[in-house]
Amino acid sequence: MAGVLVSGTDTGAGKTILCAALAAWWLAHRRTPAAILKPVQCGPGDREYYRTVFGDALSVLNPLYFEAPLAPPLAAAREGQTVDIGLLWKSYCEAAAGHALVLVEGVGGLGCPLGWDYTVADLARDWRLPVLLVAPLRLGVVGQLVAHTGFARAQNLDLSALVLSEIEPVSAEQRAQWADVQLIENLCHLPVLGVLSHLEAATDRAALAAAGSGLWLEAAGTLFTAERG
């Protein structure tokens, strides 16, 4: 089993589209069982999108759902509940036992709280997952990545690689000015797997698979290998 946590520098950084692109590529080329696990979702969006894109071709797991689009402990408290970390772990173990690939989509960034004293970074460390960090390609992305990679190392995470995501259309000139790959790799001491281009048809599985293909080719043998799972 290969498992990986896809985290972002913030809410709306491109985690969901990246997970979908990687899953679409996997289903098209590996043809072995895969799952996307969204441990906690607050408000509608991600799981519904995945189910629209993949239907029955992919297991979409969401053990905890809360109505309010807030940080998980606050959303849970509104419903008189708490975030059961043990339930999340059980769901991951069950997914790992039955799938060749489990993409775990984080909530917000690595510092996002899952409980009152537990963050996404704690989950990544406790579950011993390699982390793929995605950041939106815009002005300021270099500083965001430097800050987040520093935080990840301070938390003793297995931060393995970076991805840039065009959440909006970006020109070649803007890409070069805002996100110089050599500069990012020098400062973060991590490989940039590539740029996930903006997709006009984000529910098109073929387009998603094509977008994920370059990232998978770069990641092969380093991030998503059964030995690391």
From Swiss-Prot:
SUPFAM superfamilies cross-referenced by the UniProt entry: P-loop containing nucleoside triphosphate hydrolases
Catalytic residue list: K38
Xref: CDD domains: DTBS
Residues noted as binding ATP in the record, renumbered to the chain: G12, A13, G14, K15, T16, I17, D46, E105, G106, V107, G108, S165, E166
Entry's localization field: Cytoplasm
Pfam families for the chain: AAA_26
A GO term for molecular function: dethiobiotin synthase activity
InterPro entries noted in UniProt: DTB_synth_BioD, P-loop_NTPase
Keyword check for DNA-binding: no
Keywords per UniProt: ATP-binding, Biotin biosynthesis, Cytoplasm, Ligase, Magnesium, Metal-binding, Nucleotide-binding
Residues involved in Mg(2+) binding: T16, D46, E105
Cofactor(s) needed for function: Mg(2+)
EC number, UniProt record: 6.3.3.3
One cellular component term from this protein's GO annotations in UniProt: cytosol
Reactions this protein catalyses: (7R,8S)-7,8-diammoniononanoate + CO2 + ATP = (4R,5S)-dethiobiotin + ADP + phosphate + 3 H(+); (7R,8S)-8-amino-7-(carboxyamino)nonanoate + ATP = (4R,5S)-dethiobiotin + ADP + phosphate + H(+)
Pathway(s) served: Cofactor biosynthesis; biotin biosynthesis; biotin from 7,8-diaminononanoate: step 1/2
Entry superkingdom: Bacteria
GO-annotated biological processes: biotin biosynthetic process
Function of the molecule: Catalyzes a mechanistically unusual reaction, the ATP-dependent insertion of CO2 between the N7 and N8 nitrogen atoms of 7,8-diaminopelargonic acid (DAPA, also called 7,8-diammoniononanoate) to form a ureido ring. This cyanobacterium does not encode bioA (which catalyzes the formation of the precursor for this reaction in the cannonical pathway), instead it encodes bioU, which replaces bioA and also performs the first half of the cannonical BioD reaction. Thus in this organism BioD has a different substrate.
Entry-linked NCBIfam families: bioD (TIGR00347)
Family: Belongs to the dethiobiotin synthetase family.
Oligomer status and interactors: Homodimer.
Name used for this protein in its record: ATP-dependent dethiobiotin synthetase BioD
Lineage: Bacteria, Bacillati, Cyanobacteriota, Cyanophyceae, Gloeobacterales
